[in-house]
Amino acid sequence: IFLSAVAVHAVESIPGVTSHYQTVELGDGSRLQAIVAYPDDTSAPLQPLVFTQWVSCGSLEYREGSNAREVLAALARDSGLALVRVERDALDGTGPTCAELDYDTELEHYVQAFARLFDDPRIDASRVFVYGSSLGSTTAPLVAHELEKLGFAIGGVMVQGGGGVTYLERMLNFERNYLERRPESVAAAAIPDEMLLRTRFQYEYLVAGRHPDDIAGDGPEMARIRADILGMGESDQYGRPYAWHQQAARHNFLAAWAAIDAPVLVIFNEFDQYEIRHGHKLIVDTVNRARPGTATFVERPNIGHSDNRFATLEDAYAGREGTPTWQETAVILTRWLNEQT
């Protein structure tokens, strides 16, 4: 169901690109704003490139100077596909805001919204491409697999900044990087015991589904860990409800990757502050075992999670003096898409 195509704030302006705003209504009554962007000179429907975004909330509209949004703008302009984005905040109180949204509902909203947007006359849904960035790398294979089950042919899936390990492993990698990459604050000899404590906390939180405050009540060590978990606030982690992360921990990302019948591109940035190489390579190895030669692995030296180049791993973790490399990322993604189309 498409409603009035009116933006409630400034419409994005990408040179050489037309951005069409519309509202899509979902089965639970939520109304989400969507943006379909394509080159100005487009005269025929284009196959869609749907985007699944990172964990943090915020609009997906183009904003000059944001590495991630510059990449999206380049894809809209140069990929030969229609870039399809869906904002996660429900409009006018019709559903949850992004900060209230849990993982399973976010996933369902993506699938429903994209499927309905494929009826747009600007879109040729004969093949669908999916791009996931950061934690969107976990929703990307799940969305692609669900769209396949609805009968849509997946032309390719691209991810950067997220691997195929379990969510528990992912968050433990966050913790290990947090300890290892701050040598001025954490002694190497203290890391093994600290990781055991953090593993206990993360298991209770993500797998057992306990509230962080309840875990903190188990004793002073757990209380100390609770106060020092990355991104964890009084009622959220990285701006999302605890339930978002606990539901993510119940999903089998690797099974989705193995099931998708499509080419796959995985980009790993060597100095990623959160993710590790193994998780990215695991996707490629799993897909290539199931469908030999269909998955591509690209490793980019000296680059961090958010597409900046740094001199050292420690500089990357501290965010010191990074140089944007989004143009390089856009070229890698666009070339790969052109090879598939």
Predicted regions and their residues:
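Accessory cap/linker subdomain of secreted extracellular hydrolases
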Residues: 160-259
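Conserved alpha/beta-hydrolase "acid-adjacent" motif
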Residues: 273-281
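Conserved alpha/beta-hydrolase
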Residues: 72-93
